[in-house]
A protein has these predicted regions:
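N-terminal signal peptide c-region/cleavage motif recognized by signal peptidases
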Residues: 3-5
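A low-complexity, Ser/Thr/Gly/Pro-enriched, surface-exposed linker/loop concept
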Residues: 33-72
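Catalytic and substrate-binding clefts that recognize carbohydrates or anionic sugar/phosphate headgroups
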Residues: 69-223, 233-234, 239, 246-251
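Aromatic- and carboxylate-enriched substrate-binding clefts and catalytic-loop regions
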Residues: 115, 255-500
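N-terminal small/glycine-rich loop or linker at the start of catalytic domains
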Residues: 219-232, 336-347
Length: 500
């Protein structure tokens, strides 16, 4: 399926549904969004969510034609494709799952089927998952989340806070925040409420995905250079190494659009980086032993028409030894609020607006002024925040970095990142992680790339050539490398990569 991105950079979303589309029945509320899509809510406190969430950002659609009727026992809502039957006064969810309190009958587009809360869907065509870290053949298939299309003719978006995502995160609400310039996470109206979207599109998969983007947000159009070739390798390259690489690419007439600088750009405690043990996976200051004039090198890259990206592992915060200047500026600005004396650092605290503003002002904007075009968010650490219950670090990093990128003038916003769950299509290109170097891993990636379109995630970028390895004979196997490159030609993001 071809997913067409939106060219518009500013899209006005409104999470409050058209009043004519909303039917309230006691502690239950139903919103008819399209003839094939109904939102089902149930709250014992009758507290319903009208704000955006991590998954859903727009409910202001024209109310479709439908009829509503009821008797002493049931409420009925009927559209051209769906018929909802709700036993009044009951929680639609039952244990075990059963059709006793709520059913939605789907008809049309080649399907006649009945859905009820908790009904399994063995025919779902799958979506994607957070990462291919450690991929060995089919090992990641079981981790793939359900997609929005199914041969059953229906699919479900469970946006309830009580239903954890695959990484343990939850779908928080988003509330306008004038201080940040974009909405910020906040608690849901009722953390125990049911909040489910039922998509009954039959076999009209294209319309299902199109209508999903109407409520979950458009897929932003990536910058043109994203679709060129990316040079990337995990190796402690010096500035002269990069100059030689750029020269070789030109000499061999390999058109290249992006030069990725992996984690050795900063002090990282690696002997190869001559960093005297400073830093680790996380770092913010240039390793001047390798790259003595960072701004000059990035300027050279730009002069040869290379866009630049830097790798980030943010989880360990800002260390006083690795980044003394950034540490001092942020610690002074924040009044020592997030200081961890035992580790000599400022804790990573993107949950909070004051930390986020200081971090972007002092560190990220500084590097962007040097010439960094976009960021590779290589989050591999704890999956949920240690400070905010079930806040997904992957999704929240993606959300914040993309919204901050949108503030830059003259740049179409883009980040390179792992999938953070439904809603991540709004941050349009993905990094699939550290796959194993093997024929089995390569064989799985075309399937994995294609199914991601079933959640609107159309632009996976893989480590072409693989990264991790257990079989040394395959690491530089020319046939395997060639076949991976052939696959890369038809992959949305053409980025070769390798271990050091």
């Amino acid at each position: 399926l071809l997913l067409t991105p939106s060219m518009a950079q500013v899209v006005v979303n409104d999470p409050v549904a058209t009043s004519q589309a909303v039917i309230t029945c006691g502690n239950a509320r139903f919103t008819v969004l399209t003839p094939e899509m109904i939102r089902v809510e149930y709250s014992e406190q009758a507290k319903f969510e009208d704000r955006a969430t991590f998954t859903i950002v727009n409910r202001k659609l024209d109310a479709p034609q439908f009829t509503k009727s009821e008797d002493d026992t049931y409420l009925y809502i009927t559209t051209s494709n769906l018929k909802l039957k709700y036993r009044k006064g009951t929680d639609p969810r039952t244990l075990p799952a059963s059709p006793s309190n709520l059913t939605i009958t789907i008809s049309g587009n080649g399907v006649s089927s009945v859905w009820y809360p908790g009904k399994p869907d063995p025919l779902n065509l799958k979506g994607t998952s957070r990462t291919l870290d450690g991929l060995m053949g089919e090992s990641k298939r079981a981790e793939m989340e359900n997609g929005l299309v199914s041969r059953s003719g229906w699919a479900v978006i469970d946006d309830s806070w009580a239903s954890p995502r695959s990484d343990g995160g939850r779908s928080y609400a988003l509330s306008p925040n004038s201080d940040m310039g974009y909405p910020w996470w906040t608690q849901r109206a009722d953390n125990h409420a049911m909040d489910t979207y039922v998509l009954g599109y039959g076999h009209n998969y294209k319309k299902a995905l199109a209508d999903y983007t109407k409520i979950a947000g458009n897929i932003p159009l990536p910058p043109n250079y994203i679709f060129g070739y990316w040079y990337s390798k995990y190796s402690s390259y010096s500035a002269d190494d990069y100059r030689n690489i750029m020269s070789d690419l030109k000499t061999n007439k390999i058109p290249t659009d992006v030069m990725v600088i992996d984690m050795d750009w900063h002090w990282n405690g690696n002997a190869y980086s001559q960093s005297e043990g400073r830093g680790g996976w996380t770092g913010w200051s240039w390793n001047t032993n390798l790259i003595p004039n960072p701004k000059g090198l990035l300027s050279e890259m730009h002069s040869q028409n290379f866009k630049t990206a830097l790798n980030l592992h943010p989880a360990d915060g800002i260390n006083q030894i690795e980044s003394p200047t950034y540490f001092a500026a942020m610690n002074s600005e924040l009044g020592g609020k997030y200081l961890n004396d035992s580790r000599n650092n400022i804790n990573w605290s993107l949950d909070y607006t004051d930390f986020t503003k200081s971090f972007f002002k002092n560190i990220i904007r500084d590097h962007e002024s040097e010439g960094v075009d976009f960021w590779w968010l290589d989050w591999q650490q704890y999956l949920t925040s240690p400070y905010t219950n079930s806040l997904s670090e992957t999704f929240w990093c993606n959300y914040v970095f993309f919204n901050e990128a949108a503030k830059r003038t003259g740049h179409r916003p883009v980040i390179f990142h792992r999938w953070g769950g439904l809603g991540s299509h709004r941050y349009q290109i993905g990094f699939s992680g550290d796959a194993n170097i093997s024929y089995e891993a390569l064989a799985f990636e075309p399937y994995f790339t294609a199914t991601a379109s079933n959640v609107g995630y159309g632009y996976w970028g893989h480590d072409l050539g693989g990264h991790m390895f257990s079989n040394e004979e395959l690491v530089n196997n020319p046939n395997l490398v060639l076949r991976w490159i052939q696959f890369g030609v038809f992959t949305p993001i053409f980025r070769t990569h390798a271990t050091n």
